[in-house]
Amino acid sequence: MKILVIDIQGLIKQVFVRAFSKDNDVEILNAGFNSLNLINVFLQKFPDLVIIDENTARSNFGNSLNNVLNNISLPVVFIAQNEMLPNFGCLEQSKEKVKLIINKLNFKLTVDLFRSKYLALIKLELKNLGKNKLISSFEVKRIQAPDFSSNSKVELRENNLNDSSIRKSYRVSDVINFAPKNDPDVIIKYQGLINKHKTGKIIVVGSSTGGTEALRIFLRSFKKDSPPIIIVQHMPGGFTKSFAKNLNNEFNIDIKEAEDGDILRPGLVIIANGSYHLIVKYSSGNYFVNLLDGPLVSRHKPSVNVLFRSAAMYAGSNAIGVILTGMGDDGAVCMLEMKKNGAYTIAQDQETSVVFGMPMEAIKIGAVDKILPLSEIADHVLRRS
């Protein structure tokens, strides 16, 4: 899990760095107080959640921070002077992203008291948030200020705490309700193979964690006469346009963010808009894309499963499906649909994947024809086209 801490005074970050020092699965990220650095952290590091201090929200940097938060779909943890009356400052417009509020007094305790009485609870809540980036599905929770009365005792220790003991020992306003992991049916219902015409090849690609760099390696082999490519890279809305523009400046092919109705042609690469699901369809001799709003699918929007299902239905054996590095299982189920409808499917191997989640899940269910290292995938795609 990657936690981005934005704290103008540095106290909160120090606490979390020390608190998670023995957790090998947790990385504390820092973006400083530069807007460009902040955007780069989201594009390159893919944090699972963001922690913001109230003083930071009320500072001059708060405006830049608010602009970024409006374009991401990650849960925010807010450190407030008063957890019942938080002052969101410049973040007032994006306060709906805040899903956990912690009283700042917790961080002013001695290290021993903090670790024994509050750290286990806070760590549990952060890990729950980090595992489930469904911000619309959370009820706001508040961790109250410590009890400094003379009768208060520290009885619990971090190493013997579990979910039930924590929930019984502390007053937390609500229980987190996780939204279901939506099936692609909520966006596009599977109707079998709709288009049975033989056409030129189209390439559909899904990627997530580590995908921004993987796509750069994948795309460098393609030319102006290469088959059209449609890509879903898990990335917040607002960032996909600049990502596509940067790629377009790097390669000798046309790369753009998807717009509704874009017609596919050789040498064109379409990057899914981070705010919409993307599907490919076929009509009157042309493949084209549509942007669809709606709920998260496989915990993502855009979802690889949505794109792959549309390719299974409208392209069939005319499609080549590629699943690259990424966490989770988005894309696996509908890559199998593609394969069953005649598409050729490829997965990145474990050795070259930053996270071998999405490719592994596709391989496990028999959705993959070929497993290849990243450096060989593009050439193999071109040979099959």
Swiss-Prot record:
Which InterPro entries has this protein been placed in? CheB-like, CheB_C, Sig_transdc_resp-reg_Me-estase
One Pfam family name is CheB_methylest
- Taking the first listed entry, what is the main subcellular location of this protein, grouped into a coarse class? cytoplasm
- The active site consists of S208, H234, D330
| Protein keywords | Chemotaxis, Cytoplasm, Hydrolase, Phosphoprotein
| Main EC class the enzyme belongs to | hydrolase
Which GO cellular component terms, listed alphabetically, does the Swiss-Prot or TrEMBL entry include?
cytoplasm
Catalyzes what?
A: [protein]-L-glutamate 5-O-methyl ester + H2O = L-glutamyl-[protein] + methanol + H(+); L-glutaminyl-[protein] + H2O = L-glutamyl-[protein] + NH4(+)
What Gene Ontology molecular-function terms does this entry list? phosphorelay response regulator activity; protein-glutamate methylesterase activity; protein-glutamine glutaminase activity
Q: How is it modified after translation?
A: Phosphorylated by CheA. Phosphorylation of the N-terminal regulatory domain activates the methylesterase activity.
Keyword Ribosomal protein assigned: no
Q: Where does the source fall among the domains of life?
A: Bacteria
Q: Which CDD domains match?
A: CheB_Rec (cd16432)
- The residues covered by the CheB-type methylesterase domain are 196-385
Which residues does this entry mark as bearing 4-aspartylphosphate?
Answer: D53
Per the UniProt entry, the Enzyme Commission number(s) are 3.1.1.61, 3.5.1.44
- Spell out the subcellular localization from the entry: Cytoplasm
**For this chain's UniProt record, which GO biological process terms are given?**
chemotaxis
Task: Quote the record's domain comment.
Answer: Contains a C-terminal catalytic domain, and an N-terminal region which modulates catalytic activity.
Q: Which family is this protein grouped under?
A: Belongs to the CheB family.
Q: What does this protein do?
A: Involved in chemotaxis. Part of a chemotaxis signal transduction system that modulates chemotaxis in response to various stimuli. Catalyzes the demethylation of specific methylglutamate residues introduced into the chemoreceptors (methyl-accepting chemotaxis proteins or MCP) by CheR. Also mediates the irreversible deamidation of specific glutamine residues to glutamic acid.
Q: This chain belongs to which protein, by name?
A: Protein-glutamate methylesterase/protein-glutamine glutaminase
